[in-house]
Amino acid sequence: MSEPKTILVVEDEPDEVAYLSTLFADNGYHVISASNGQEGFEKAKAQRPDLITLDISMPEESGVRLFRDLQADPAMAGIPVVMITGVTHEFKRFIETRRQVHPPAAYFDKPPDRDQLLAKINELLKPVAAR
């Protein structure tokens, strides 16, 4: 049996971290978390998750900055990023104006719809041949 896929949850709100961590763990994923962008980058670099969920508004280093840093690092640029944030519309508009930045794999408003979020996570983490 293969190892469970790892999801890194980068979120500064403890309740949201608990919700997402429980949701993903209950569905067979290994979950690690970080409370800000700087910690998220360090954990992504050290643990190479299969997918990252990311909030935009966080202390110390914003999700936007972390997203750009991940895209700029060749070792991490291929990790799918799912934005889960309260400012989805503004972020989408920001990314659409930046041609040098690829958009994230998906966007979800807070609180995300559980079934839609899981469907997208499952789709993104399917083996490439199964997609």
Where are the model-predicted features located?
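Non-catalytic signal-transmission and effector/linker regions of two-component phosphorelay proteins
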Residues: 1-8, 113-131
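Conserved acidic carboxylate
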Residues: 11
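Two-component/phosphorelay signaling modules centered on CheY-like receiver
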Residues: 14-32
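Alpha4 helix (beta4-alpha4-beta5 surface) of REC/receiver domains from two-component response regulators
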Residues: 18, 65, 88-109, 115-119
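Acidic catalytic/metal-coordinating carboxylates
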Residues: 36-39, 62-68
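Active-site beta3 strand of CheY-like receiver
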Residues: 47-53, 58
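The feature encodes the CheY-like receiver
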Residues: 59, 68, 77, 89
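Hydrophobic/aromatic residues positioned on beta-strands within the core alpha/beta folds
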Residues: 84-86
